[in-house]
């Protein structure tokens, strides 16, 4: 082969290919290859691996879609598709690139080496990609041909500000179940945009800015077969750490705009931007984004796993119903989820400050979104039990060494067509007595768990369903500190050290259905949705719970200065929430209009010591001979000793809710919830609303029954430099309408035995109730 440049002396140990690719490698399209010159071919030697560098200016793809099978009420299965139309890739200019020559150029780089020790073959893969802005003009759910579609969700875009990095190293094969593998995945500083067009051709955006999912890990990647003892692993792609020595590190990421400042390894920063035109930007000083909420997680986790697979003939969502909501399908053809679907499950154990396994301890962050934002970092994550029964039986009374954890349970993704969807029944609520006047029943019935997707009468919308079954989050944060966004400087930066107070938001056996579809209301693009969500209050032994509790971790001198672990809050929350309606980005707010919102719950207002804690005082019976009496029982969440009162409620009506983002200043960045809840009363599609307070000793009840009327609300949460402020405002009958007067038609007393007695009623024709609370934690 002729070499016109006489450069044969410059040989490479790797194969170097120069190609022009018409689309990013993750998109299932054809690639156009540029013809290689003799000069380029002369550099090929391929002795030591494969090196591919692909650069391109832009790409246009007509349609990208995912198809799924869906059952129907007539027992015939159909095919539905989720279609991204008008897909394009364009430059936006990378800020951080693995190669200076790549800055601003769309590119994919792959470096693959394969080596052998004689007994095994190892693989080393290093790759990076920069795709600029990946945009789809619309997202619709369509029939099998893609010709008949529902309304658009809006337009979607993903914007990369630096390279995506994926590295993998293994010493024995690629999907070897018993071969340890090192993995790096760097999704850093991505921006996600949902753009909806409101009436008047005004574009508004919901944005996840500076998204990070940046981790390194040691573990195993393989495809499980039908012999796996864990059912979720069967016929699935499995990533797991498996052994105690292996781990996942969520590493913090340098802020793309503020050198030397870092955001969480998993960073979900949600903001709102109104009247955007056609621009995709989070850095417009003339139209800054407004913060909504930021969630973050960093640090080392262990006992982690990720499972992904396809599932067949799932009955997880129940039967498909016709538009009348009467006729239900049967068999696979009538199963709402159909014969195909996607499945995922993720779990991990958190580490804490004295058990970090050589890495950084796990931390969680909750903050206002955007810039000029304060937040709170939670750490020292532990289970609910301070000591187990085994620990208390030990003369040394050691602390519980088990780790806090989360487990998403089974998560299913399906395209569906149905009037109703099924949620698993909460037996506690179904068996919890709820007496209203002379009518005795239960808080919920089986019918409450078959909830509506929509209230239309002509046809069911084709929709995306995400179903969660058995999500557990068994973690209590025992240490907390205030934090701020990267742009905050000087005296505005929180300086307080980590403090011994915490927040417990554990939940047990959470089940949920989330249904979404595109729709149009009064000329505005909106998101149709239906929600069903339930939690279980506790398990039988009381070591898992759904609760909202504050923790005081002051030193206990009677327990070697371990934390005292006082708590107060709502515990053992059995809850069911169902709703349907539409969501839109309008008028600088996120609006949810729900024609029907039902909330049913049973819970306890309680305060005391966390299970297994050493009492701070010497109680009767506590002695050296009877040390067990010096500790809170490990099953104390199954007892009534800490309970001030029980609460039962069922509220049913319509709600219009505005989630109002804060303005881009330290003083103004807050999150507000503004709207009204119209309690309808029994009749038609609605049931009676009631709130009942239960005596924990004898079970007698005072009931505020048959509640009707309209309640307006304006509530705000504001995290400051060293305080957390809550503002609540309730307006009764805000429209001053005679038929919307707030009324408790019956105030009843229900003794533990015997018949209930009506005490009277309460009517509020108008008025306002305001409450402001500010918490300033101190050690």
What are these regions (language model features)?
Residues 1-35, 44:
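Gram-negative bacterial Sec-dependent N-terminal signal peptides
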Residues 37-39:
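General structural concept
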Residues 43, 48-779:
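N-terminal low-complexity, acidic/Ser/Thr/Gly/Pro-rich segments
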